[in-house]
C-alpha cells in the first residue's frame, strides 16, 4: 500500500515538461527568447525585435526583493493576519476530524467498520466540496463563498453531535467533509487571489505554514476533550467553534486590498481614461 507514495515521483518529468514557469520567474532568469515568444502571442500587434529587452515593472521587482515584508505593506497587514487565522481554523477542523472522527463515531456506538465508512464518506464529501466551491467561486465572490462554507461546516459539525439516524449521519458527514476539507482547499485559492503575483508564493506559503499551528493543536486538544469523557455533542461543538472563528476571520479580510480588486480598479480607470 505504501508504494502508492511513489506515484508523485513518476509524475515529476511530466510536470516539469508541461507546467509553465511564471513570466516573473522567467524575467528573473533572463529567458528573453521565451518571453518574446509569449509576448508575441499575447500582443501580435506589438513590434518586438530580436534585440528588444523585456523588463519587469520596477515596483514589482522591488517587491520581489522583500517578499515577506510585502505581505504587510500597502494595507495588507491586517488581512494577512486574518488569512493566517482562517488557515489555522480550517486546518484545525480538518486534522481534528482526520484524527478523531473514527474514535468519535465509535463513541457514538458504531462499530469500527461503520466508523471507518464515515471517514470514507467524509473524504468523498471533500472532493464534492472542492469542486462545488471552485465552481461557485467563479460565479460569485470567492470571499463570500468561503464564509458560507465555514458557517455551513460549523452548523453541520454541531448537527453531527445530535443526529441519531445512521442514514442521516452519512449525509451530515458528507456535508461536513465538503465544508471543512473542501473549505481548506478553497482557502488556498483565496490566498492566491488576494496576493499579487510577486508575493503570491510567499503569501500562500506563509498562510499554509502558520496554519499548521491549527493542525498541530487540533489532535492534541480534541484528544484531551475525549479523555475528559465529555458528551459527544461537546466534542463536535469544539470543532465547530473553529469554523465560526474562521468565518469571522475571512469576513474581516479587506477585499479591496486583494490583487484581483486592485487589477479590476486599474482596468476601470484605464477604460474611463480612454
Report each predicted region and the residues it spans:
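A membrane-interface helix-boundary motif in multi-pass transporters
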Residues: 1-5, 226-241
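Structural signature of the two symmetry-related core transmembrane helices
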Residues: 144-158
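Extracytoplasmic gate region of multi-pass secondary transporters
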Residues: 72-131
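Helix-loop junctions at membrane interfaces in 12-TM secondary transporters
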Residues: 162-171
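Intracellular cytosolic loops and amphipathic helices of Major Facilitator Superfamily
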Residues: 18-79, 261-274
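Intracellular juxtamembrane helix-capping segments at the cytosolic ends
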Residues: 182-195
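Multi-pass alpha-helical transporter architecture, strongest
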Residues: 14-20, 24, 240-268
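Interfacial helix-cap and linker-helix signal at transmembrane-aqueous boundaries
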Residues: 105-106, 136-137, 222-230
Amino acid at each position: 500500500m505504501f508504494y502508492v507514495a511513489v506515484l508523485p515521483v513518476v509524475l515529476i518529468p511530466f510536470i516539469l515538461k508541461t507546467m509553465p514557469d511564471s513570466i516573473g520567474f522567467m524575467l528573473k532568469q533572463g529567458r528573453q527568447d521565451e518571453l518574446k515568444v509569449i509576448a508575441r502571442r499575447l500582443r501580435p500587434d506589438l513590434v518586438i525585435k530580436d534585440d528588444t529587452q523585456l523588463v519587469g515593472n520596477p515596483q514589482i521587482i522591488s517587491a520581489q526583493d522583500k517578499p515577506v515584508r510585502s505581505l504587510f505593506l500597502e494595507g495588507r497587514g491586517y488581512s494577512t493576519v486574518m488569512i493566517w487565522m482562517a488557515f489555522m481554523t480550517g486546518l484545525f477542523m480538518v486534522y481534528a476530524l482526520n484524527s478523531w472522527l473514527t474514535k468519535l463515531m465509535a463513541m457514538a456506538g458504531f462499530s469500527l467498520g461503520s466508523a471507518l465508512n464515515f471517514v470514507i464518506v467524509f473524504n468523498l464529501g471533500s472532493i464534492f466540496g472542492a469542486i462545488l466551491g471552485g465552481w461557485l467561486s467563479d460565479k460569485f465572490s470567492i470571499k463570500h463563498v468561503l464564509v458560507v462554507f465555514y458557517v455551513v461546516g460549523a452548523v453541520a459539525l454541531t448537527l453531527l453531535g445530535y443526529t441519531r439516524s445512521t442514514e442521516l449521519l452519512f449525509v451530515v458527514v458528507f456535508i461536513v467533509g465538503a465544508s471543512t476539507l473542501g473549505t481548506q482547499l478553497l482557502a488556498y485559492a483565496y490566498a492566491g487571489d488576494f496576493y499579487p503575483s510577486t508575493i503570491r508564493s510567499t503569501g500562500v506559503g506563509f498562510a499554509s505554514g502558520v496554519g499548521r499551528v491549527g493542525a498541530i493543536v487540533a489532535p492534541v486538544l480534541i484528544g484531551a476533550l475525549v479523555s475528559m469523557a465529555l458528551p459527544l455533542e461537546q466534542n463536535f461543538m469544539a470543532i465547530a467553534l473553529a469554523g465560526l472563528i474562521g468565518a469571522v476571520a475571512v469576513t474581516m479580510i479587506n477585499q479591496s486590498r486583494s490583487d484581483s480588486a486592485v487589477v479590476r480598479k486599474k482596468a476601470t480607470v484605464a477604460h474611463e481614461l480612454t
